[in-house]
Amino acid sequence: MSASPPISAGDYLSAPEPDALKPAGPTPSQSRFQVDLVTESAGDGETTVGFDSSPPEYVAEPPPDGLRDSVSGGEEAKGRFRVVNFAASSPDAAPAETAQNGDTVMSEGSLHSSTGGQQHHHYDTHTNTYYLRTFGHNTIDAVPKIDFYRQTAAPLGEKLIRPTLSELHDELDKEPFEDGFANGEELTPAEESAAKDVSESKGVVKFGWIKGVLVRCMLNIWGVMLFIRMTWIVGQAGIAYSCIIVIMATVVTTITGCSTSAIATNGFVRGGGAYYLISRSLGPEFGGSIGLIFAFANAVAVAMYVVGFAETVVELLMDSGLLMIDQTNDIRVIGTITVILLLGISVAGMEWEAKAQIFLLVILITAIFNYFIGSFIAVDSKKKFGFFSYDAGILAENFGPDFRGQTFFSVFSIFFPAATGILAGANISGDLADPQMAIPKGTLLAILITGLVYVGVAISAGACIVRDATGIESNFTLISNCTDAACKYGYDFSSCRPTVEGEVSSCKFGLHNDFQVMSVVSGFSPLISAGIFSATLSSALASLVSAPKVFQALCKDNIYPGIAIFGKGYGKNNEPLRGYFLTFGIALAFILIAELNVIAPIISNFFLASYALINFSVFHASLANSPGWRPSFKYYNMWASLAGAILCCVVMFIINWWAALLTNVIVLSLYIYVSYKKPDVNWGSSTQALTYHQALTHSLQLCGVADHIKTFRPQCLVMTGAPNSRPAILHLVHAFTKNVGLMLCGHVRISSRRPNFKELNSDMLRYQRWLLNNNSKAFYTCVVAEDLRQGTQYMLQAAGLGRLRPNTLVIGFKNDWRTGDIKEVETYINLIHDAFDFQYGVVILRLREGLDISHIQGQDDSSGMKDVVVSVDISKDSDGDSSKPSSKATSVQNSPAVQKDEDDDGKAHTQPLLKKDKKSPTVPLNVADQRLLDASQQFQQKQGKGTVDVWWLFDDGGLTLLIPYLIANKKKWKDCKIRVFIGGKINRIDHDRRAMATLLSKFRIDFSDITVLGDINTKPKSEGLTEFAEMIEPYKLREDDMEQEAAEKLKSEEPWRITDNELELYKAKGNRQIRLNELLKEHSSTANLIVMSMPLARKGAVSSALYMAWLDTLSKDLPPILLVRGNHQSVLTFYS
């Protein structure tokens, strides 16, 4: 017996103590979870765990019989784990009744620890057997389990969900509860369902790598090309070039096979073959386009192979004089009968189809062996056909090329389609027992075997058959002046060689002239015909199965409308019966046409396009460097995959250039359609990964780029609150930042309590999704703070990333400053001061009607920040034309404020962003609210012919001029002219106008007019002075009416108050704001937008109330006006 090491403090365990010394622990009903006694091993001869008052020991002898019976009554199963026996060092140390009492997990309210060698028994609330459980099965915290990582319901049942972070981390409920499902002590309903599904799914047919992949790939690669074209290729290209052609094709397919293997081993592969591999790697755009043409190509390939079979049968009938009608119609009849029989095999189930494939493979291999055996048997009767068995002279003669009307690449284009069957196994990935193992092993081995056979046939045919033969017996006399290899056998075939290039040989036999040479060489020629039948039928059968499987996966993803009906599966194997009949219909249509010479190259190019994208998928995923790209197949290389993709594209044009162009046009058209439709899927494709990678890389690169005037972009932090609560400011800022600069929608949630971060995260995702769905190129960010100023300071300091940081603060004008809490005015003005302190520019937007529409449905946040309930539909692009006037809605329900949102399931439906009570009645909008709602949408509409008036009174670096220039360049504003207003002296108006015109020309900014205002400092009208005085009256300190000490105290408590000294000191500046308002009304009352230099107030010298009064006086009763003040860093330059 060997003792285990002492228990460390980190184990949080202590040995049991006598019951009298133990504090009262929780009863089973009081503890939070009820967990049973569990261990992983039991039985005689096994290592079991002993316990007593000393540190635990491991014992090898079996437990006493009494304890065995008392603990569990023998070994029994409970849930997913066994309840087994436990042994003690002595029966006295662990009484039977102690083990029988059951165990209770320590409650969350109690503590249990030990430090050093001392044991703190006071906190130990566990019974003895607590320490004997298998680790991880005595808490709600789950141990690693594969079921937690399934994305959807697994074949073994429903998806299991691990305990959430909230369940483990959040505060306990007041009432403790018992959880019998914690870590699997009992079967959950999902697991019970899984167990039931396992018992019901035993009849499902799943193939291994040989029957599922190797056999199918070999049958598809060994097509009729092996029997009727390989020898002709040797005659044209010679042995050397033929081997090079086979090796080149094999290199392309091997690279593609490695790429396929890499994708297939980068996670669980479902049904769908090439479509599934490409779509889950490159995304739905490429996957959807390839999936459709790949399924169609397989369907038409069925017709190609069946017609090839029918032509061979008709030739045999013609030789025997047994034609039924004529050659063409006989092909149609035989082809129709054949495809019906193949459909019956496919519909019968994958198991029958697999058996048929095995039978056909046996015939095919027998035919190949029949050829090689026959090549060693020299028969005199075959010499007249050019077959002399193996001869060094024939090998030397046939080693080089002898192209007759062909070139190397034309011959290569004829052979390459024979090598395009490598996805036959991957296409039924859903029917494989272990796709991750089967696809790499079966595909690559099939490429190797078939490649060796093709090379063997090329060498064999070139070494024993001459290129031309007459088929006429020789008289075996010595032939003079004969240099051919057949001469020494007494045959002179020199007359067969064409004397003029392009002339057809007069002989009908030999490598050049006879497509049935392999029948001549073979030991038993009918076996070659059987091999041809086997090759064509097996390929047709594989394509007939592949097309519905791929199409079924495409239908289930719902990328194209109207095809979901074909995604339904039947039976235990989820067979796509509707897909089978659709494939049968397509194949039958092309069989009846019986002219496949035009469609054949297109089909080959469809397959090659799929291979190219599979290779590109691996390169793309490797380039993205995503942590999720971890294929277990290591024998791939991203650059080899890129080379494979390029080679596939090159081969497409070699085979047929117009077919390659047509294929690319079809793929591009389908790609554009799927991109436009934007299917609601998220597969974690490499496109997404590369987008992140590029964004990260470029963001880091930007950090090393110094600021320059020419690269300045307005990057705006827009204090919108909830994004659609102030749509007007969102739309206007979007007009000059879209595709130009950054827009960050800032939202400060005011709360003095602990924030609900779960709700905060949910809202962040929801609001960002709303921006995306409404084509607003902006980001949403939210912070929780005790007041608005603190939250805004957080954003001013931390918003953005690297160089993608805001440089301009955009806020709405505070229309209710005179009726609201004056402390909010203090906060508002301090926001402006804070922005300037952080070197931000500041932009303030004011509309007569106001900006905030969130109150229209009565949803005001209790925290003080108004959250959105109404959302304005901006589904059209902000630059698109929208000249139609807004509808005059009479209620919230009928207003365009209702938006289209999406739930987690991706289904769109109409609802407000924040749901309101369904039982609440529809409230008609009053006139003011209707005007507010209409005003909030005015920047969505086409502005028509109007003006954007720029009052550039103070040089702030050019931001006041840049913003209207960017706005006027947008499609909705393109008919608006820019008018510039500047201040100047009456006696030099022309000079100032010419100087400004020169500056604007150097800035390359178009303008329609420049107005120099020489009367800005004229005294304003008395009405304006009176209104201003009445405006500021409630906010005066009136220090003359009180003691100096009391006045100073009041000023310190209420710093927003206006002192008489301050008012007198800034009297001229206040009068200027009144006068400017008069001039604005005079010159710009009909403008579509006014952009004006914002007056500054010195911090600490001008009170908040006085500054607010200036801004109000300057901008009241006007069209939409932007008050702009840059940070006085140049943003415009006339240098190149």
Curated annotation (Swiss-Prot):
Catalytic activity as recorded in UniProt: K(+)(out) + 2 chloride(out) + Na(+)(out) = K(+)(in) + 2 chloride(in) + Na(+)(in)
Transmembrane segments: 209-234, 239-261, 286-314, 328-351, 352-376, 408-427, 439-462, 524-551, 577-595, 596-619, 637-656, 657-672
Protein name, per record: Solute carrier family 12 member 2
Effect caused by changing residue 686 to A: Severely impairs transporter activity
A Pfam family that the UniProt record links to this protein: SLC12
Residues bearing PTM Phosphothreonine: 125, 129, 134, 139, 152, 1059
Alphabetical list of NCBIfam families matching this protein: 2a30 (TIGR00930)
Keyword Cell membrane in annotation: yes
Subunit structure: Homodimer; adopts a domain-swap conformation at the scissor helices connecting the transmembrane domain and C-terminal domain.
Binding site for chloride 1: 223-225, 417-418, 421-422
Gene Ontology biological process terms in this record: ammonium transmembrane transport; cell volume homeostasis; chloride ion homeostasis; chloride transmembrane transport; ear development; inner ear morphogenesis; potassium ion homeostasis; potassium ion import across plasma membrane
Protein residues bound to chloride 2: 294, 607, 611
Disulphide bonds in the chain: 496-507
Inhibition and activation profile: Activated following phosphorylation by OXSR1/OSR1 and STK39/SPAK. Inhibited by bumetanide.
Localization, UniProt: Basolateral cell membrane
Post-translational modification: Phosphorylated at Thr-125, Thr-129 and Thr-134 by OXSR1/OSR1 and STK39/SPAK downstream of WNK kinases (WNK1, WNK2, WNK3 or WNK4), promoting its activity.
Positions of K(+) binding: 220-221, 305, 417-418, 420
Family statement drawn from the similarity comment of this UniProt entry: Belongs to the SLC12A transporter family.
GO molecular function list: ammonium channel activity; chloride:monoatomic cation symporter activity; identical protein binding; metal ion binding; sodium:potassium:chloride symporter activity
Entry-listed glycosylation sites: 475, 481
UniProt-reported outcome of changing residue 538 to A: Severely impairs transporter activity
